[in-house]
Amino acid sequence: MMKWVLFIPELYYLLMAVVFFACSLSRRLQSGVLYRWAVILAGGGLLATVLAVNQNGFIFFDCYRVDLYSQLFKILLALGTFWVIFSCSELQGIDSRYHAEFFLLTTVCTLGMMMLVSANELLTVYVSIELSSYSLYLLVPMRKQTEIYVETGIKYFMIGVTASAFMLFGISFIFGVAHTTYVPDLVKTLPSLIKEPAAIIGLVLTLCGFFFKQALFPFHSWAPDVYMGAANQVTTYIATASKMAAAAMVIRFVNLSGGESPLFTQVLVGLAVLSMTFGNLVAIIQKDLKRLLAYSSIAHAGYMMIGILTMSEHGVASAIYYSAAYLVMNFACFMVIMKVADDGRNLQIKELAGLHKRSPLLAMTLMLGLFGLAGIPPTVGFTGKFLVFAAALRKGYLILVIIGMINATISLYYYLIVIKAAYLLEPERPYPDVRVDTWTRALSYGLIVLMIYLGVFPDQFVALTEAAARSLP
């Protein structure tokens, strides 16, 4: 008998998707009613995922592995999805005809990413990543004035399909070398074969698909255009929840090499350095806040890679911690964008002028989120960078850590430009007051507390990430 209890979170999101599909068939359902049901269902999904955290086992002929590592990332996915849906009380940037489809595709994408982090076999990985990717391809062009932004959707689709083709090609190389597609078998056989060119090529090509999702240089070209072209709500989802699944799979697949190939490690070091440097330098000249955060995400993919490439328990744990920290910090910034640009427009940095007067709470949330991304204590971002750099130092990557610290210093410049606009600049013209309802206030206070608490008292969560790292095969 199959252990269906191991599949409870995924079954819940599958049923949730069916509900939204039924809602999409009826055009009489008001957006307010749809939103309330979406929040309730997303909250239920988060609860179901948290309750399933201690489940362990294999299902679907061992193609699906449930352990603490996968369950922790599922909680991050469910949390990110809940936050995004909770903050979507007004879907101003999305065509009113597609509000039900927005919730449907968001749910299906979350389902695909949950399947991805538990996938224990390469073809299951491929099917899962395609399920999540095609949902995102459809979400991006849903913005109002689609004729203007349809180019963004097409570009995202074409680059994504190319990345998927590379990944499938890499899987064929791995199968040809190792004669298996099961991850536990690859863990045993691939380290001894990793010095063979075919094995290295296969692993690198497979990782290309995940690097694309993570926006790691040079697989980043879609990110700035998609962040700008998609509706604010869709961009928030792409920048937060979808990055969790990519991080989970990069960690899992990098560890397949077992650290036996110096060439493979050097490639990862190069990608980390290029991502940090390119992302931070190009972010300096940005005027659009979403585009700035897009280049920031490229840099943060590089920071995360520092922990991953150590291929140690501490390195993996630090990368997991950094992923969770990034989810909280990035969502805080994008929530402010959604609330300030409540008509669905893209937000220029100069439009934040005087935000501390129009909405002191949102200004504080944005400031702490940016301080965290910059790695300033006592925020969760500082602790995340400290753990990542410490793990790299333990493995002797001193030069890499120095480069990372230099890049973190560079990032201070453009993050402080945004904070300066919110707190020190006077608006060039009168901007409307920012409407902050009770639920937004509660969410803002919660994010502020979380960003500081996890930064000052990280011990419990660090212990959880270390336990998750130990559960990896």
Swiss-Prot record:
Query: What Pfam families does the database record attribute to this sequence?
Result: Proton_antipo_M
Membrane topology per the record?
Answer: Multi-pass membrane protein
Please state where this protein is localized: Cell inner membrane
GO CC field = plasma membrane
Q: What is its EC number?
A: 7.1.1.-
Annotated signal sequence is: none
Q: Which reaction does it catalyse?
A: a quinone + NADH + 5 H(+)(in) = a quinol + NAD(+) + 4 H(+)(out)
Enzyme's top EC category: translocase
Keyword Phosphoprotein assigned to the entry: answer is no
Disulfide bridge partners, by residue number: none
Q: Which GO terms describe its molecular function?
A: NADH dehydrogenase (ubiquinone) activity; NADH:ubiquinone reductase (non-electrogenic) activity; quinone binding
Which branch of life, at top level?
A: Bacteria
Q: What parts of the sequence cross the membrane? A: 5-25, 33-53, 66-86, 102-122, 157-177, 199-219, 226-248, 265-285, 292-312, 318-338, 362-382, 399-419, 445-465
Q: Which GO terms describe its biological process?
A: ATP synthesis coupled electron transport
What keywords sit in the KW lines? Answer: Cell inner membrane, Cell membrane, Membrane, NAD, Quinone, Translocase, Transmembrane, Transmembrane helix, Transport, Ubiquinone
The entry sums up its family as follows: Belongs to the complex I subunit 2 family.
- Report quaternary structure and partners: NDH-1 is composed of 14 different subunits. Subunits NuoA, H, J, K, L, M, N constitute the membrane sector of the complex.
This molecule's function is given as:
NDH-1 shuttles electrons from NADH, via FMN and iron-sulfur (Fe-S) centers, to quinones in the respiratory chain. The immediate electron acceptor for the enzyme in this species is believed to be ubiquinone. Couples the redox reaction to proton translocation (for every two electrons transferred, four hydrogen ions are translocated across the cytoplasmic membrane), and thus conserves the redox energy in a proton gradient.
Record PANTHER family: NADH DEHYDROGENASE
Put simply, this protein is called NADH-quinone oxidoreductase subunit N 1
- Name the species this protein comes from: Syntrophobacter fumaroxidans (strain DSM 10017 / MPOB)
